Amino acid sequence: MSNEIRLGFIGIVMDDRGAADEINHIVGEYSAVVKARIGVPDNRTASGVIGLIVEGDNLTIGSLTAKLGNLKGVQVKSALSKQK
């Protein structure tokens, strides 16, 4: 994997907002690469969506994405720039 710094987006969908505390803890561990975040709860259901703008190397962003994706009831997709 390349150590080039890349800009990207991570989309997180929670089937149950009960996972929010775990998500927030993991995102906090990677605060050095998280440049912005937005959370949108669905008040009709217990679900929600979080968007992260990230800037970092592939290894770090991949690790963040993997940890989030391993949470129960959480789906994660990411897109990164080819180069900065």
For each feature predicted by the language model, list its residue ranges.
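Long, contiguous binding/interaction regions
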Residues: 1-84
